[in-house]
Design a protein with these regions (language model features):
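A short secondary-structure junction signal
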Residues: 94-99
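Active-site nucleotide-donor binding segment shared across nucleotidyl transfer reactions
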Residues: 1-16, 20-29, 33, 179, ...
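Conserved catalytic core of two-metal-ion nucleotidyltransferases
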Residues: 29-92, 112-209, 214-243
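Mobile amphipathic helical/loop "lid" adjacent to a hydrophobic cofactor/ligand pocket
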Residues: 108-110
Length: 243
């Protein structure tokens, strides 16, 4: 939306994500050990036991961006970050698709709230009760394995027609046609050219409705509860004409 509506960063948005198809995401993870520059750290569930994000965070070494939540975990890397997420396939059958996405979303909420030490607040009292019983019974490691299995359950599916935001905040928004992400076009973003889906209009309407309508000033908030920030050697950095 930033690229289309603002031709760059959304002024009040403090977050930037990169999304990939599952096959590209898995390949990305496979080349990280040999290709990642020394000034970056790839934070995953595998290399930091206290980190349970379902996606990968690329963090800048010798910087700090501590939020209200992550400040509770001093042993994890809390550098300035960029999130890298996969878009996963789901069933072509409408009923099975609904079950898969509901189960995936539920497993993610269980992991999140188990990690945070908070109660699950579901759509109904009964659902909340069941979820919190599961949260108390099962260890975090087990819940995380279930979550990861559900996220990529259909990764080897033949002729998939639907994708969903398996790792991101739109996991409960439902599936969308996989063909929307088949092709990319290059658009202006600040002083650079970056790729976005050719069917960006359909994708953005699926996410936001009338995405060209500006939200009220009163609703323009950052998405992170930042407690402390240190840009390190980048404190005096000025953006160049191109990336």
């Amino acid at each position: 939306m930033g690229a289309v509506r603002h031709k760059g960063f959304i002024p009040w948005d403090d977050d930037a994500d990169v999304m990939m198809l599952r096959k590209d995401y898995d390949r990305f993870l496979s080349v990280l050990p040999s290709e990642l520059p020394n000034y970056l750290f790839a934070q995953t569930q595998k290399n930091e036991k206290d980190s349970h994000f379902p996606f990968t965070k690329l963090r800048i070494n010798d910087t700090l961006l501590s939020t209200e939540f992550t400040s509770r975990f001093p042993n994890i890397h809390n550098g300035i970050f960029l999130d890298v997420l996969a878009q996963d396939y789901t069933s072509n059958n409408a009923f099975l698709r609904k079950i898969h996405m509901k189960a995936t979303a539920s497993s993610r909420w269980l992991v999140r709230d188990k990690w945070r030490g908070t109660s699950v607040n579901a759509n109904s009292r009964f659902s909340s009760l069941c979820a919190n019983i599961l949260r108390k019974i099962f260890p975090l490691g087990f819940l995380q394995k279930v979550q990861n299995k559900l996220i990529s359950l259909h990764k080897n599916m033949k002729n998939p027609k639907y994708l969903f935001d398996s790792m991101g905040r739109n996991v409960s928004r439902g599936a969308f046609p996989a063909e929307w992400l088949d092709e990319a076009i290059w658009v202006d973003f600040e002083n650079a050219k970056l790729p976005i889906p050719k069917e960006y209009d359909k994708y953005l309407k699926y996410l936001y409705g009338d995405y060209m309508e500006m939200i009220p000033v009163s609703e323009r908030h950052v998405s992170h509860d930042i407690k402390q920030i240190d840009l390190g050697e980048y404190a005096g950095y000025v953006c160049k004409d191109s990336f």
